[in-house]
């Protein structure tokens, strides 16, 4: 498994030769023995984010029982422990670890 890229292509998940070339060059720089290796597969996905760059964490108004924890853009893995703790605290009615207001979908997400 070698790295990741970021391309602003809307909802197009097509892989590109440019991205593959960049990833391969980075891998060879770190481990020259990979120079003759050929990729087995290439994959592309989406990195959904919010317009403000702040994830949506909390209940979605108008949809009883629907809670969100999304919109982390490229920081999903890094923020997962804290955002899941916040969501868990909110769901269970416990005092949250941080102020949940900035993350609330209320007033920020319109369905």
Predicted regions and their residues:
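Active-site lid/adjacent beta-loop-alpha segment flanking the redox-cofactor pocket in flavoenzymes
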Residues: 1-63
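C-terminal lid/capping helical subdomain adjacent to the catalytic/cofactor pocket in oxidative enzymes
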Residues: 60-111
């Amino acid at each position: 498994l070698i790295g990741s890229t970021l391309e602003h292509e809307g909802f197009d998940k097509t892989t590109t030769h440019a991205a593959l070339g960049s990833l391969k060059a980075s891998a060879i720089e770190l481990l020259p023995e990979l120079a003759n290796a050929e990729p087995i597969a290439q994959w592309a996905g989406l990195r959904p984010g919010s317009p403000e760059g702040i994830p949506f964490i909390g209940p979605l108004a108008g949809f009883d029982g629907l809670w969100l924890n999304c919109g982390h853009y490229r920081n999903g893995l890094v923020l997962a422990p804290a955002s899941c703790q916040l969501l868990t605290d909110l769901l269970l009615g416990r005092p949250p670890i941080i102020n949940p207001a900035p993350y609330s979908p209320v007033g920020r997400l319109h369905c």
